[in-house]
Amino acid sequence: MPYLLMASHNPLPAGKQLLLLVLLCAFFSSSFIPFASCSITDDLQTQCLKVSATEFAGSLKDTIDAVQQVASILSQFANAFGDFRLANAISDCLDLLDFSADELNWSLSASQNQKGKNNSTGKLSSDLRTWLSAALVNQDTCSNGFEGTNSIVQGLISAGLGQVTSLVQELLTQVHPNSNQQGPNGQIPSWVKTKDRKLLQADGVSVDAIVAQDGTGNFTNVTDAVLAAPDYSMRRYVIYIKRGTYKENVEIKKKKWNLMMIGDGMDATIISGNRSFVDGWTTFRSATFAVSGRGFIARDITFENTAGPEKHQAVALRSDSDLSVFYRCNIRGYQDTLYTHTMRQFYRDCKISGTVDFIFGDATVVFQNCQILAKKGLPNQKNSITAQGRKDPNEPTGISIQFCNITADSDLEAASVNSTPTYLGRPWKLYSRTVIMQSFLSNVIRPEGWLEWNGDFALNSLFYGEYMNYGPGAGLGSRVKWPGYQVFNESTQAKNYTVAQFIEGNLWLPSTGVKYTAEFGV
């Protein structure tokens, strides 16, 4: 029975090495199956694809087969190690390959049935490019997880991951980047229930489960509440988390669709963890809170990682949730605080704090009306607010920051903003893309604005833009002179990075009830 919640204000053995090598060599010397045919409407081909619909479906099936075969080989070594970090890296890869298989299957399903329930926005070209981009980045994340390990495994699987990457990159070239196809009548997809549309704005919210440390709810920890939630739910399932500090690492797996979590306020309901790279966790697995199920919403909650700056990569929140919303949430840590890993995401009225690359990943994400706070780093360290991870020019991904306040946190203010030089971002990958617009930049931002990653890497291919920012850190006279950096002089240039255009917000944000500005109005 639902409850009513009032709105809150507040080293592998030699034998196994040989087996793995033989299996991988056998797989990668084999040929792929020929294209399979399927029945897809001519509309799909003319509006969304640059190749025949049959060829596109066949390419998807080939890529799915490649992913599954790599995963099958790697799974034989899942429990073969005593090395904690290596075991985590393999576990990550298996999960990430599983993500990729799902994303490719969604693409296949949606392209064959444009009105199916698995379609998210109803705008097929946007959905396909989003899911294919996610499938692309997963292989990179898998490889990155082997940093700090000494194992033959990384070298052996790199060929397989590279082959999957090439196949997905080819698929991305087959989808039109700017299709004229619209969602159903330009409105909210038909599968979204009307009663789900105002959950964030209602005075009362009907909840399905309550988490309370004092035993007054259905569960005393968040993880148990998540496990009890239905799989693949087509309606919103609401979990209310009462005030308190919940010291646990929460993972919302990919089958948990349309979960919503509501706390008693960002300073009242806190989910806290301390995993870090130094302690043997991969960056991906270090997250205090990780969500992969599509359609996730969080409101009035703090997600924190307390590992501290000396522990290096330590994620507070990681999202792979397509069409996810974080509203009035506090996301705090130091290095790598917020991992916007993949998919389409929206953050509104949030507080995000950290040091090095503290907003990073390869999602398509917009931040509106957020406080972005640079903290005091380690001695001789430089802060970079963003580190966007776009590796292919056909990806629609990037970071857009609009109507936000970018300032120093209290610890950096107390030490002097000059003690830790702070920059708007640096290019993690070759086609890194970040836009800052209509935001207040305090004197914490260095006059150069942006920071190199490693020499001249990506300076020609990145895309960094600024538009109508203000404040002592917004001066443009001393900004970097990189070929990939530009200042927008016209709104027509900046419009591409608004909620309406960049994340197709008008097609799905109304279903969440969250406040948002579609373009440039305050």
Swiss-Prot record:
Gene Ontology BP terms: cell wall modification; pectin catabolic process
Site, as annotated: Transition state stabilizer: Q335
Record flagged with keyword Signal: yes
Cited PROSITE patterns: PECTINESTERASE_1, PECTINESTERASE_2
Region (Pectinesterase inhibitor PPE8B): 31-174
Glycosylation sites recorded in the entry for this protein: N105, N118, N119, N218, N221, N274, N405, N489, N496
MF (Gene Ontology): enzyme inhibitor activity; pectinesterase activity
Subcellular location, record wording: Secreted, Cell wall
Keywords, ordered alphabetically: Aspartyl esterase, Cell wall, Cell wall biogenesis/degradation, Disulfide bond, Glycoprotein, Hydrolase, Secreted, Signal
Reaction(s) catalysed (UniProt annotation): [(1->4)-alpha-D-galacturonosyl methyl ester](n) + n H2O = [(1->4)-alpha-D-galacturonosyl](n) + n methanol + n H(+)
Disulfide bond entries: C350-C370
Pectinesterase PPE8B, as annotated region: 208-506
GO CC entries: extracellular region
Miscellaneous comment text of the record: The PMEI region may act as an autoinhibitory domain and prevent untimely PME activity during transport.
Family: In the N-terminal section; belongs to the PMEI family. In the C-terminal section; belongs to the pectinesterase family.
UniProt protein name: Pectinesterase/pectinesterase inhibitor PPE8B
